[in-house]
């Protein structure tokens, strides 16, 4: 069976859903990773209004397209972040932000993540992708000094916050895929392992594998896939490109994307330093059969050009695993 190539609709949420579906189908995509913001999916309406759900389903069915995943990245960030501030206010729905009081924001965000699981089940989407936030990301520099107890406490708090959410995912038969990403509880190899450990490797909690966030950290992408393949539930299609010229630093965190003083930047597929041929082989080898969801995060290429090229390149790599079939002619 041919692997689905999906378009992540988050960077297209300014356009009506039907328009994005028409564009995506015309470019050769099989479906969408459907963003739960902008003009694409209202979770509260979807969980309570059968007619609204039918509208969403029909929009896909009429075009022969699939809901490969539902994204709730923006809200998920607020569940575990230690500090809730104006950054969250810019991206959270008003109903989640409310009066901005931190505990209330976290509680409403947690309930919204549960709603996302219920909506995914109703719309027959197998995965909800998203962020989690982190109680300890603000300690990343290690100064002022931190202790092992500080870090342990952060992971324990994370498990307390997310276990009840994943209970609902389990009840609904839907997987949650954390996009491993700086600012989240898992951002590299070792923090991925620790996060899965603290969540007891429960099946409802897994990974959205995005090489663009790992490559610039010098993580072995194929090794990462081999280690965590059983918990890779979703995959983003993008790259990163390094520009370490003796002046540009690897952190680059306070520079806008696209600034030439950055030591790395996101790149569209085919325009960075990631070998998607090798990644597809590795994903096939660990049995990943889900979609690759193309995400436009490139400050140097327009979104239509980027995603049109990406699906063509991925299609040339995204063949099903052959196993040992090529040897059958010799038997």
What are these regions (language model features)?
Residues 1-15:
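Boundary/entry segment of secreted carbohydrate-active catalytic domains
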Residues 4, 31, 70, 146-273, ...:
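Acidic/histidine-rich catalytic cores of soluble enzymes
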Residues 8-12, 35-39, 72-75, 133-135, ...:
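Active-site beta-loop-alpha junctions enriched in small/polar residues
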Residues 14, 19, 23, 62, ...:
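Active-site acidic/histidine proton-transfer and metal-coordination neighborhood
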Residues 20-38, 124:
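Catalytic domains of carbohydrate-active enzymes, especially glycoside hydrolases
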Residues 24, 32, 60, 70, ...:
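Conserved, mostly hydrophobic/aromatic
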Residues 35-57, 136-139:
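Glycine-rich, proline-tolerant flexible connector loops at the mouths of alpha/beta enzymes
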Residues 299-331:
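Aromatic-rich peripheral "rim/lid" segments of glycoside hydrolase catalytic domains that contact
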């Amino acid at each position: 069976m041919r692997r689905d190539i999906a378009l992540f609709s988050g960077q297209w949420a300014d356009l009506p859903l039907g328009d994005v579906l028409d564009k995506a189908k015309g470019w050769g995509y099989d479906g969408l990773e459907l963003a739960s913001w902008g003009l694409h999916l209202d979770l509260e309406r979807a969980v309570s209004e059968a007619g609204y759900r039918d509208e969403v389903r029909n929009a896909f069915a009429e075009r022969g397209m699939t809901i490969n995943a539902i994204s709730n990245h923006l809200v998920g960030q607020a569940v575990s972040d230690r500090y809730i501030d104006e950054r969250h206010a810019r991206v959270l729905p008003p109903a989640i932000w409310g009066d901005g009081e931190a505990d209330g924001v976290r509680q409403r965000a947690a309930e919204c993540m549960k709603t996302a699981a219920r909506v995914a089940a109703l719309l027959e989407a197998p995965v909800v992708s998203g962020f989690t936030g982190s109680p300890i990301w603000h300690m990343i520099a290690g100064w002022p000094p931190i202790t092992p107890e500080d870090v342990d406490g952060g992971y324990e708090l994370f498990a307390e916050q997310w276990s009840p959410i994943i209970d609902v995912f389990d009840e609904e038969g839907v997987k949650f895929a954390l996009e491993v990403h700086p600012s989240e509880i898992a951002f590299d190899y070792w923090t991925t392992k620790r996060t899965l450990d603290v969540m007891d490797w429960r099946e409802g909690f897994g990974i959205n594998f995005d090489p663009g966030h790992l490559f610039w950290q010098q993580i072995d992408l194929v090794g990462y896939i081999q280690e965590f393949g059983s918990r890779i539930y979703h995959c983003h299609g993008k790259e990163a490109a390094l520009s370490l010229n003796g002046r540009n630093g690897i952190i680059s965190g306070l520079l806008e994307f696209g600034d030439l003083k950055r030591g790395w930047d996101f790149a569209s597929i085919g325009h960075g330093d990631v070998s998607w041929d090798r990644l597809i082989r590795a994903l096939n080898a660990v049995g990943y059969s889900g979609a690759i969801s193309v995400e436009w995060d490139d400050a140097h290429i327009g979104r239509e050009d980027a995603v049109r090229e990406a699906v063509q390149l991925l299609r040339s790599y995204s063949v099903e695993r052959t196993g040992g079939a090529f040897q059958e002619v010799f038997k």
